[in-house]
């Protein structure tokens, strides 16, 4: 007899996961996007909420943490739910705590007392362990969790789920169940859009392009690019696919459509272009909802160019959504989309992770993206994470996925592999950080540290392999290099292998550990006034980009004195991030002088959401310094600087 939960008939993989959790086992759930994995998380929350035990729900990005906080608050009552994302802390003693994975990792790494009360940790989107920059966070979260904690690991389809589960079982010494499903509730149809053929399948497209006589080869396009005007012109004269024509060809029965672009500005520009057409008419219901929201917004928000564009496009059921938007704008878009009033939503890939709002159709503007290092093709996990948003369970018989094709970069075999199925395994990205090293030294003997460093997923994957010892030696070599660096900086006493006061301080600092420990665990910070303190922390958070512009900077006397003080210390004098101090004055000095968020925004071309993210990082750093502090003087200074910053963000900085 089928099991019913929350009015839904459970699939077998959901039943199996629940049975394992009832046996106090950890569970790795591998299933396609949109298949109902999160229902297993709902079950474990229901179970332990009744038993008065604590649950932690971790998410890879803030958007998903915020979404879960709202959903769970409605489902279980706000008093039972807490949120911790670094810069925002709400109800931290709640029975159900939602947080980014980094926050949980920091808690277990520093030996936070509250971790002892946790019964279950839900790792949503655990396949993020593949992330080159952040994957180590998931490994460390599992390695350093108490043995009493059980895990529910939710992942998109991964071929080596059993191996991952076996690793957890081996290092945590309890049974871990693997539950897999390869079946989507709503099957996907993968199609392509060509400027000449329109929407077609891959085989027909390949056959057609083979017959095109002047079809440029993939390699020749990039060889010719930049070799003079003629080569560049030849690339540009190749007709490009048109998103408006694609929307026309989809027709009214294939919307709502999520149209993914990997550029925030491109999302807005495409929405503007589509809104100029007559494909969609103005919808009175949308206009009314927009008016109800906007009337409560600050005057400055109403005047933003982004707000003006959003009002015009939303009126026709066309929207855009990305991390560069103010939270209140995103909330309006999400409400309209959830009500089925938006026909086409141009969005970045964060929507595929952070918001559980599927559509009938998913379109890709391109199958390449910039990953922070270079432009590259999507891997299968990235493709299916986004494509999986196509098809609404109980509404659509199939989900349609359409990728725009650029002939000059067309490769049949690559596209065939990409769209066939998600075959990318999860792999270890373990990297030893300064903070991890500090906490290992603080809590363990040399022998224990060497044992712990052998617990990485990579070491397990390579067990018995000739490269296993090579990897272990590499990690130990990295550990010894960091240890010597800490000794030179005065964070570690080499005689007795114990942390100094600066080292103890920085066990609770998770970025720029040595610089912040050098300044704030000593007398140096006492030389700084509030403006200089804010400027210094901001400089460490700022990530300069070539396109970022400021109309005016403010290299005042506080700035000049801070530069001089930084130059006096041999450690701070070498920090390259302080080269950005002059630019950072544009985002800090006006705040000290009484300006607000919009004062800063009018002085830069940064998107509103990017500026909020920057200030959020500063608040997170302030929280870390406050928690690490040994004395009231520093705590009071952090309270003061935080108060100044929050005043400037009043009415803007929202969950």
Give, region by region, the residue ranges found by the protein language model.
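Conserved C-terminal RecA-like helicase domain
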Residues: 54-58, 65-69, 73-83, 260, ...
